[in-house]
Amino acid sequence: MLAAANRTGVRLIIPLVDNWVWQGGRAEYAGWRGKTKDDFWTDPQLIADFEQTIRFILTRTNTVTGVRYADDKAVLCWETGNEIASPPAWTREIAHYIKTLDTNHLVMDGFNASTLRAESLDIPDVDIVTTHHYPGNKKSFAELIRANAEMAKGKKPYIVGEFGFVSTAQMAEAMQAILQSSCSGGMLWSLRFRDRDGGFYWHSEPGLGGNLYKAFHWPASTMGADYDEINLMAIVRSNAFAIRGLTMPPVSVPSPPKLLPITDASEISWQGSVGAAGYQVERAANRGGGWQIIASNVDEALTQYRPQFADEHAPAGEWFYRVRAKNESGLSEPSNLVGPVKVANVTLVDELADFSKIQERSGGWKLATHDCRAAREDAQRAAGAAGDGLLYQLPPAIQSYRVFVFFPKEEGDVKFSVSDDNQHFHEIAAQKEIHFHGAGEYGYWKPVLFHAENISSGKFLKIELTGETQIGRVEISHPALSP
């Protein structure tokens, strides 16, 4: 990470401990010694343990760069902790200890508050102060930021370390407060990067985020419409240049994506390009040319932790694929070429963003986009109840199906049947795969994969529910047509 930061000119704020349990925090330090998490601030043994960790980190030599962390220019500052409730005496001791090991870097007080603590401004070894802002305060983010900036003015640099989970208008107002005050900068919560297996990493916010907000993705897409991602990201980009006194340049044409190996034409993924708003997928019968555009504006945010594209209409045969990234400034050069990919069957893939791929539906089906954490970040689902049904029509004959479902309450069953004429159906027994380790603190729903192979009959597939169920994805394969 430090090597990458140096290559790209990024500077890192690195917290040395977390207040929360997710990455391991003060409770874990205390637990190792049989003490309580509040002892972390005053117990000599726990403080010594933490200082041992600090010494290990700061004096470690990076095996990639050959540079000690304490000497690495990629580090902007060491933060005493993330959102910690540290007493001033603890902060004073830890900040001083950091400075005895590292005279090259700044120290930021990680005390968790929306209003600056006066004591932090008086600690000599604290160089930067910060606040975090989320819903729940009587004052607006902008009011608090202006007051904090005035309080820190002439004493220490002030950074808004996190802010989020409010409307675009309120976020824009907060950014203006950062720009117009003596504040040194601000960071939205939060931005997730691309997955090496294709698409993005996802993080929905069921707590303070109210089951509405998710981590943002650049350059944004309609998948974030519920929280106005496209408009907010445009405002962020504008202000990122404004705070540096720079004129905002046009968006660059994206670089070519990297197409990943393809074993099935229904499972095509690529590593995306920075700034790409969509992707053009192309297919050809040979390496030399004759490329056909088979999809012109694929949104890589449409799927979560699944392949980004299925070539549902590939003719039988062997095919080559490539992908181009695109945005408002133009089209990238082609990706690497992958193939030949042998196609005997093709697969209808329905992510349930809408009901457009369904021939008929019965009952009270609704599209569900909230509760994504409980659904393992699946952002588009069809929610139904006992007796509800879906009907898909495909070219004959259906070969196999896979249906990914969640049971928000009790685990139920799903019935599957096929027909040649949409009149006479016979049931196809499904196998069930369950990978579930409990609801956990987020109330995860039970995920179940229903699947059947070697069907070789029918052109209609009926799906019937026996209880409250949400379907996240449907895959139905059938023979590919001749070229």
Locations of regions flagged by a protein language model:
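Conserved structural position at the C-terminal beta-strand
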Residues: 325, 463-465
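Extracellular fibronectin type III
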Residues: 326-345
